[in-house]
């Protein structure tokens, strides 16, 4: 049975922080949005990969976790009644007369005047270590992200890797876990020097262990890990006890169907102009980590700025005969009414 076509003003692809803030900025100029995301919840990488990891560079928030930021954004956009389509990936994007039609892999069909791509780096999957039978342990005692740190309280945790994620989670989980062992193939790290310094201080104090080597084999039953075999730099092997293993070898980013939509691309990113954040296709915008332009910084706050400018241009497509008068939320009674504060 064919699903009925949904009609709206704007389609936002991606429900990460930048996509969520786009709902807010579009709402201020009377543009209603439907949001599509391949994940099962809002937040993007913030909630999927580091929901409890602290973020320090959001203006006005000294410290906030990925989950907290997502919750605040979801609360902020409530007045605009955005509709979400989770667990769906956009498969096709077609141009119509005066707009676009998007079809997802769940056969949802949405038509809108503008499309906003806020899909981060595209779809992402953690890089899986090439270990025999690792899939038997995944989701039970091998994890690529931390949803709730409390679930690791009192556990013997082995963290594998030498980048920022490995070091950050070593530091964040140290007060929670029974023991933390950081394993890396060499003594040099690809992480922030301050994090490396803090980690080495914990090693010196005996609060965590650091070992050199690579995991070659997993040991356990019914998906529950109890130890791993490690091959050291000298070729000798040893067993490392572990109830939980967390490998951080980076992410594999895939642009996915976006690459087939006829947009100009540059190194798997979407070039935009910095006045409107419009792509090479009129009416299609790209904001956040998926876009590129001279001086681009991949920061959440940069994406917020891009969303604000995008909304001003999107208004011209949704309301071509209506001039947009710029207003401030602090002084505009009409904007305050939309936000439900007046």
Where are these regions (language model features)?
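A conserved FAD-binding loop/helix module that cradles the flavin
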Residues: 167-169, 290-336
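Predominantly flavin-linked oxidoreductase catalytic cores and closely associated redox partners
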Residues: 95-97, 108-204, 210
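N-terminal Rossmann-like FAD-binding beta1-loop-alpha1 element of flavoenzymes
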Residues: 8-35, 169-174
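FAD-site-proximal beta/loop scaffold in flavoenzymes
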Residues: 130-153, 248-301, 309
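Conserved N-terminal glycine-rich FAD pyrophosphate-binding loop of Rossmann-like flavoproteins
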Residues: 40-64, 192-198
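A Rossmann-like FAD-binding core segment of flavoenzymes
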Residues: 6, 77-104, 109-112, 174-274, ...
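Glycine-rich FAD pyrophosphate-binding loop
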Residues: 27-49, 179-191
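Extreme N-terminal leader/targeting segments of oxidoreductases
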Residues: 1-9, 71
């Amino acid at each position: 049975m064919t699903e009925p076509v949904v009609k709206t003003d704007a389609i936002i692809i991606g429900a990460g922080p930048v996509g969520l803030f786009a709902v807010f900025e579009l709402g201020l100029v009377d543009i209603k949005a439907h949001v599509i995301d391949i994940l099962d919840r809002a937040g993007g990488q913030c909630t999927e990969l580091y929901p409890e990891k602290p973020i320090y560079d959001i203006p006005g928030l000294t410290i906030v976790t990925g989950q907290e930021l997502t919750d605040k954004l979801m609360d902020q956009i409530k007045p605009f009644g955005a509709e979400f389509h989770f667990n769906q990936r956009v498969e096709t994007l077609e141009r119509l007369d005066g707009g676009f039609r998007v079809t997802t892999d769940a056969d949802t069909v949405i038509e809108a005047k503008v499309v906003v791509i806020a899909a981060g780096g595209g779809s992402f999957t953690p890089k899986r270590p090439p270990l025999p039978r690792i899939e038997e342990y995944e989701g039970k005692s091998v994890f690529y992200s931390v949803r709730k740190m409390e679930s690791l309280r009192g556990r013997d945790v082995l963290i594998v890797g030498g980048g920022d994620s490995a070091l950050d989670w070593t530091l964040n989980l140290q007060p929670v876990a029974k023991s933390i062992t950081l394993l890396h193939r060499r003594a040099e790290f690809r992480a922030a020097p301050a994090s490396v310094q803090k980690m080495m201080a914990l090693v010196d104090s005996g609060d965590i262990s650091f070992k050199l080597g690579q995991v070659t084999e997993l040991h356990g039953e019914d998906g529950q890990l109890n130890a791993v075999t490690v091959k050291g730099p000298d070729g000798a092997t040893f067993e490392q006890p572990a109830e939980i293993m967390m490998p951080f070898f980076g992410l594999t980013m895939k642009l996915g169907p976006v690459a087939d939509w006829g947009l100009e691309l540059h190194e798997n990113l979407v070039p935009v102009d910095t006045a409107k954040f419009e792509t090479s296709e009129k009416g299609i915008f790209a904001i956040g980590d998926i876009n590129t332009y001279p001086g681009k910084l991949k920061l959440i706050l940069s994406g917020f700025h891009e969303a604000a400018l995008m909304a001003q241009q999107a208004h011209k497509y949704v309301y071509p005969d209506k001039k947009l008068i710029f207003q401030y939320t602090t002084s505009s009674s009409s904007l305050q009414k939309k936000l439900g504060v007046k």
